[in-house]
Amino acid sequence: MKVSCVSTACFFALGFVLHAQMHRAEQDREITYWLQAPQTHQFRISHDFNVTRLGQSSVHSFVRKGSIVSASAIYDLDTGEKLPVHNVTGKAVNALGYYPAPSPDDMVVVQGDLPHPLAAGESARVRVIETYTDPESYRISNGELTWDRTLARPRNTVVLPAGWFLTEVTVPAIISLDPDGRLMLRFNNPRNDEIHVVLKAKHR
């Protein structure tokens, strides 16, 4: 059932939401999407994660089918260094044996190369920043943008383009403003599967 942005099911909190300090591993649970001008069908993504596997020499960001990835950057958050990045296939990643579930062979995967293979007891924390172009999930019609996407992480933040206001959202959200005055929606997902979010907005 759709939830209007003015209904009581859509929680409005004007101001900034402050997070308590969390353990390093727990911070893998967040992702942020910055919607660009809807005519571009683009949104920026940023998320952090840790890797701890002995001997692992690369990290990966798996691109969802239907999205075209560009402007990829992966940073080592312990050193601030930008890692060398390049696109590989799901087949190539499967051959590494890092992940329990295989990816489709033709999947596009952004790979960042670590400075050295991880030693016993060593970990690396990285930040992935990339741009997705996806006309299917992010589009505009009659002056109203639609962003339609499933979200799997426990904490998901979506930031609207500057000057746009929310008209409709299908999942309850905590709404605030970011430091630049852009409308920001925070979706919490307590389940072990995905939530399907469809939001719509218009320009002021």
Across the structure, where does each feature detected by a protein language model lie?
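A surface-exposed beta-strand-loop module
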Residues: 71-74, 80-146, 178-204
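Extracytoplasmic
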Residues: 28, 42-44, 55-57, 69, ...
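Positively charged n-region of N-terminal signal peptides that target proteins for export
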Residues: 1-5
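Solvent-exposed beta-hairpin/edge-strand motifs
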Residues: 57-95, 148-172
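Non-catalytic C-terminal accessory domains or segments of carbohydrate-active enzymes
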Residues: 26-30, 34-36, 107-113, 117-120, ...
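Bacterial N-terminal signal peptides
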Residues: 7-17
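Early extracytoplasmic/domain-onset interaction patches
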Residues: 21-63
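Hydrophobic residues positioned within well-ordered beta-strands of beta-sheet architectures
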Residues: 29-31, 43-47, 58, 110, ...
